[in-house]
Amino acid sequence: TEIWAGLVWVCMDDDAPSFDEYIGPLKEQIEHYRLEEMVVVQDQTVHLECNWKAVFDNFGELYHVEHIHPQHALIFDCPTSRVRLWKNGHTSVYIDGFTVNTRLDIPEEPTKLMRGQLESLGMDPEEYRGRVLDVREDVQKTRRDMASQLGYNYDRLADEELSDIFQHNIFPNMLITLQPDKALLMRARPHKSDPSKCYWDKITLVMPPNEEAEISADLQFMPKPKPIPEERPEREEFTQEDVIAGKKTMDITVDQ
């Protein structure tokens, strides 16, 4: 058993390598996001009608994205994503954010989804008519400048980590998707008796902002963050059919 990044890691093999040896370079790829300072705001499990390996493998490739997640073309450049292979079966995926699919026609003005992103940072979408591809770099600068005023600490993060999606798939069944002040932990678990079924867990973490910094800077968080729960939320469990029927959601991308 090992405690790292605010998580408890368990291995039941007495002959397994140490945690540090097993996770290898991924440790330095993840730890500067300060997961241990984040708090759980949502804990969900969906019961899926597929083998646990199938759903986990889906997150390791990007060929499906343009067909299954068409909205990503409006906020990410998935065709230029990079996939890195690590020892022990781990992989990483790096996706440019605050941009558009550069293999398609570049829009003259920010997309509707991108406009919402810009407005949430206090940026004017109208300033990016004819220069949509400048948004990503300007978002990096804006977040860097606003961080100390709004109570976030991005000192350990590189510029691209302020705009892009960094996803680390930890063999055999867990992945971590990282953003500057948010992380998604997702995990596939085998069904106890039926190999054609599994459980898919999604835990959402957020970095609580410093409210005192907001007051002293005379600025507001945009949008206002949801209140941080005082206690860990109870796990919400539902079925694949609940998601298909629109009764439950993990988020649009995971649902798809």
Please provide the spans of the model-predicted regions.
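C-terminal catalytic domain of Rieske-type non-heme iron oxygenases
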Residues: 2-3, 7-256
